[in-house]
Amino acid sequence: MSSLPYPSLKDLLARRDWQNPACTHYQRLAAHPPFSSWRNLNAARDDKSSESRQILNGDWQFSYFDKPQAVPDGWLQQDLTDADTLAVPSNWQLAAYDAPIYTNVRYPIPVNPPQVPEENPTGCYSRQFTVDPAWLAEGQTRIIFDGVNSAFYLWCNGHWVGYSQDSRLPAEFDLSPWLQAGENRLAVMVLRWCDGSYLEDQDMWRMSGIFRDVSLLHKPATHLSDIRITTPLYDSFRRGELVAEVHINQPAQHRVQLQLWRDGQLVGEKTQAFGSEIIDERGAYEDRTTLCLPVEQPALWSAETPTLYRATVTLLSPEGKIIEVEAYDVGFRQVEISNGLLKLNGQPLLIRGTNRHEHHPQHGQVMDEATMRHDILLMKQHNFNAVRCSHYPNHPLWYRLCDRYGLYVVDEANIETHGMQPMNRLSDDPLWLPAMSERVTRMVQRDRNHPCIIIWSLGNESGHGCNHDALYRWVKTQDPTRPVQYEGGGANSAATDIICPMYARVDQDQPFPAVPKWSIKKWIGLPDEHRPLILCEYAHAMGNSFGGFDRYWQAFRQYPRLQGGFVWDWVDQALTRSDENGNPYWAYGGDFGDTPNDRQFCLNGLVFPDRTPHPALFEAQRAQQFFQFTFDAETLTLTVNSEYLFRQTDNERLNWRLELDGTERASGSFDLNLLPQSSASFPLLERLPMLHQPGELWLNVEVVQPLATDWSEANHRCAWDQWLVPRTLHFAPPAVAGSAPQLSQNDQTIDITHGHQRWQFTRHDGCLSQWWQHDHSQLLTPLRDNFIRAPLDNDIGISEVERIDPNAWVERWKLAGMYRLEERCTLLQADQLSDGVRVVSEHLFEADGQTLLRSRKQWLFDSEGAVSISVDVDIAASLPPPARIGLSCQLKEIHPQAQWLGLGPHENYPDRRLAAQFGRWQQPLEALHTPYIFPGENGLRCETRSLLYGGWHIDGRFHFSLSRYGLRQLMECSHQHLLQPEAGTWLSLDGFHMGVGGDDSWSPSVNQDYLLSGSHYHYQLRLKRAERS
């Protein structure tokens, strides 16, 4: 072995492999499913750790340079004196080297493929290690990098080993020629940018480094080199077959044994020699064989019933000794498209899916097992059954967990060229076919044995080109057991088995040039269109969003070929950063000084970065629930329908509860024994009491799982519904005797007094300016009309990110003058009545000399010390629909709790309230604020009948919010952690509130039904303060 490295570092850098799309690797081993090379059958069967694997994670030596040419030659032989330590796996940007960049479409480098900037941040990693002396004596020792972003060179003991790019698939090299007894030294030079970066333009943080596991694997000299497992099913799924195509690295007289296990018990086995059937006139393969093992009455795998077997593949010597064993979890299932429907095991699927980026707030793109399990448990608990690996192959452990817990997976190639113009510039260029091909073929070769993967995806947002057509054909030939999907190319793309648009709407066409997005209802009815439609992205959950999600699910359940979709997306991609005082906060694009950046567009999650749910997650849970209910109010019969396709209920109980104005009056439960796709009815006539008290009567039902499962705790609620029960009784409100309030007025004020209470209107503005109780003022600001909200991301659209969008709601409101309204009182008069005081006020709201709104109020102060407010608002025809119509003020009181009768307990809005349950709720004041990372309107509770907050008691039919943060602060503040509690409590009382929208976040997406587009609105409220003892 030469003591001098060859080629030299200078020679390697002169080749500029990282700017050559035809060069994706040097000396990298072929892709294959994950290997463990057990030497013991029982260990393989039981999935024990393998003694043939050595993990190299931990602290490595690290030196950072602004370009690869700055790396000194001596680093190949020994660490630099100023080297630091850096954890592997990690992203070096999160260790204060370089800056993470968040951008959606725009490339973070000048667009000139395949060239990348000369200033190309470079991380030089090294570490010492030793290996078992037996590994040096025999066999092959490999090093496996599960993920390195974006390209790297590898040396061992000063000798160049190889080069690789594609940041999301393993790079595996043979280290055997370079290893030595005692200490060995690895050196890895990682480049931030390479030509492959043009294929990795996903909507995510752009970070670098060795961010997945690094390990050594020792294989025997003669070893298994590839294993392909399929599970064909026959006779209406009553018979199955385990088929294993096994490859060996070199022709030999060895034999291979295939065994199938279930719960540790042997189901069947077969042993045979290598050698295939005759392929053509030149003969057969000597280095492979196919074993077929029949299985009677196999237990089928699905996301509902993720039954797994364990297959062991043992390489035997000619004498019958075990050379090595590989093992895989096996699920018997069949995926097909027939009659225009995607089916699993013969049943049409309804995809309850989400897109998921690999993201951790502290660790960036480093995934650990605990985070992966947490994500899966949350998905299962909230009725998700599918996940799209957006937009790259995930950590290999992810698929094993999805196999075991039960999630359908779309495995997606690491290809996105969204920032190219046109988008298909690279995908239609044969020069880029080798690079694209390796990203697809190596994904399939690594992941094909996982039952959870039901669809392959050719990538994301790369237009449509001839390269896609070639890759589609390759996948269909190599794996005919799964469909292929790809969104690019518009309505007529042939490179997909599934219509998988993003952000197509339920009823609204979006006729974009070349790539129209028809409404999903229309799409499945186009001439000669017979494919299923599954939205690859929909319901953009950016901040306070997700409005109209229920409309999609109404359509999915109504039209069989609308088979669901994948919500965008799972987790807010914010990173933890510390402010100047060392306090941590969640940072988004631009917070690291990164350019270009797309600010908060990375905050689209159903969960916060720490996996705390957004309110939208509950909306998804309710819409996607596997049990549907109907209630016949005439016969008082409840019917429950199971949407499980394969699972019989064996751990479900149906609970019912009758509530009068939120107070329980009767309850009961039934055992729920339902076959898949069946229903059962439960008569409640004999169980419901006769009630004569006034109030709203609600029937609540829920399905709970009494016993804990692999993914939920005991008594997990998995479905619910409720109905307002009709009542024929009418009740007159009781008469209340008491002294009438007294009126006094002068040129400046109108004052009303009742006992220990006093109210005051000021004539100059016509507002209720103060409310005293026992001479203590209760208001910090007057009670005023409110027609605006702190803009949501959906209100802003693409304004303030790339350009001003005149169609965005916030721009339309600005142009109309809604943020600079001048309020003018045109009427304020008061009258003493026999039983109270009446005040009538009228206000005009003007901008640029035009009257935009007119608000007329009638205030009745009664003998109970309460004030009833009747509000009428007229809206000018020229005004765009306002965000809200209501009243607001700043209360002096700060109370730790609020109680209300209405929809809750979590935040809800008029177009996102499917998951909000009518009842009597109590929550801490701080829980009424939803801490969206980018502040805006939040915390609303709709359809409220009564609100108790400290001494305040408010009745009517209204929406409310209570917050320590005022509207102006919410409008002006850029981050949640910068919000400062204000004096008192801000109270908003809305008679009407516009929806939040959510079909997407860059165009107006609030459905017409939830816009305040009328010309006149009326609402009523009753406010009272409790007498203090």
UniProtKB/Swiss-Prot annotation:
Site feature: Transition state stabilizer: 357, 391
Keywords for the protein's UniProt record, in alphabetical order: Glycosidase, Hydrolase, Magnesium, Metal-binding, Sodium
EC number: 3.2.1.23
InterPro entries: B-gal_small/dom_5 (IPR004199), Bact_Beta-galactosidase (IPR050347), Beta-gal/glucu_dom_sf (IPR036156), Gal_mutarotase_sf_dom (IPR011013), Galactose-bd-like_sf (IPR008979), GH-type_carb-bd (IPR014718), Glyco_hydro_2 (IPR006101), Glyco_hydro_2_AS (IPR023232)
HAMAP family reported in the protein's UniProt record: Beta_gal
Organism: Serratia proteamaculans (strain 568)
The protein, known as: Beta-galactosidase
Lineage, highest ranks first: Bacteria, Pseudomonadati, Pseudomonadota, Gammaproteobacteria, Enterobacterales
Binding site for Mg(2+) 2: 597
Free-text comment on the cofactor: Binds 2 magnesium ions per monomer. Binds 1 sodium ion per monomer.
Binding positions for substrate per the UniProt entry: 104, 203, 461, 537-540, 604, 1002
Amino acids binding Na(+): 203, 601, 604
Gene3D superfamilies reported for this sequence: 2.70.98.10, Galactose-binding domain-like, Glycosidases, Immunoglobulins
SUPFAM superfamilies named among the record's database cross-references: (Trans)glycosidases, beta-Galactosidase/glucuronidase domain, Galactose mutarotase-like, Galactose-binding domain-like
Example of a GO cellular component annotation carried by this entry: beta-galactosidase complex
Residues that, per the record, bind Mg(2+) 1: 416, 418, 461
Similarity annotation: Belongs to the glycosyl hydrolase 2 family.
Origin: domain of life: Bacteria
Quaternary structure annotation from Swiss-Prot or TrEMBL: Homotetramer.
Any one GO molecular-function label of the UniProt entry: beta-galactosidase activity
